[in-house]
Amino acid sequence: MEPRAIVLKLIEHKHISVEEAEFFMNRVMKGEVSEILLSSFVTAMRAKGESVDEVLGCTLALRKNALKPKTVFPFDLLDTCGTGGDGQGTINVSTLSAITLASLGVKVAKHGNRSVSSHTGSSDILARLGYQTEATQEEVEAHLISRGFTFLFAPMWHPSMKYAGSVRKELGFRTVFNMIGPLSNPFSPQFQIIGVYQPELTELFIKVLQYLGLKRALVCHSRDGLDEFSIFQTTDYTLLENEVISRHSFDPRTLGFSSLKREEVYADSSEHAEVLARRVLNSEPIAGTHAVALNAGAGLFVMGKVKTIEQGYKIAWEALLSGKTRKYFEDLISKE
């Protein structure tokens, strides 16, 4: 295979195979592809529209070149990493729901990064709340064993991504790189929730997760444009269970929500995002707390801890309102 020939196929609006995508991205991860060729590759793929095989191939290359954990974890893992990029400016729902899930006994390996399109990425908000996000590999693995929660800072675990950094920054628009990050948790969790920035990606992502062999996974996009479960509008999601894919919708009205304030979910700055996150963790019954409970409830559903998302929401809501999640997080950061 020759990288230029692969790019030419994409320019001609032809799909490339899993093998071709993996070959090209593997060369990128080794610093063997010029920035001009890489820019052409991701731009042509974006213009054509990324296929399942292309995203899968690029994901396999990123996983192959990531750091590998030295620990064999004796339990099932969940990740709540999403694509971001929905442009909505909501609080860090997936991060706060990950903390809530960990407080309920779910082992969470949260894979994330600094802000890309929002005011605060998962790394940013955790740091603002007092959590050490840039720990060593040994510390990250030890935290999961001892605390049931850990954070994998993507740049540390994917050092080969440095070869793509300047191209991504210069282009400034979403490419296949925005897709493969959430699919490339180095701890290879068996369970995963991914929120995506476009509705059609729920189908693409669940098929990639199916190939990757996850036990159970869920990919969602809400009808008001969020890459998470919405408390305001119906959320459409695909579910992978026992290697079978199914399609569903969740209407938050089934939870009896009324008079929820959007300003309690949306942040206009990193400082505002921190204020809202602290209000959620401090058990205030605001809209943001409902949003976190709903998404944590979906996590309990994916893990098989409950039979429905509604049941999961009620358990997560109680953990947040009772102070259980707050106490867990306080214990977590007191050990930093």
UniProtKB/Swiss-Prot annotation:
Mg(2+) 1 binds at residues 94, 228. 5-phospho-alpha-D-ribose 1-diphosphate binds at residues 82, 85-86, 90, 92-95, 110-118, 122. The keyword NADP does not apply. SUPFAM superfamilies: Nucleoside phosphorylase/phosphoribosyltransferase catalytic domain, Nucleoside phosphorylase/phosphoribosyltransferase N-terminal domain. It holds the Pfam family Glycos_trans_3N. Binds 2 magnesium ions per monomer. This is Anthranilate phosphoribosyltransferase. It comes from Leptospira borgpetersenii serovar Hardjo-bovis (strain JB197). The lineage of its organism: Bacteria, Pseudomonadati, Spirochaetota, Spirochaetia, Leptospirales. The gene is trpD.
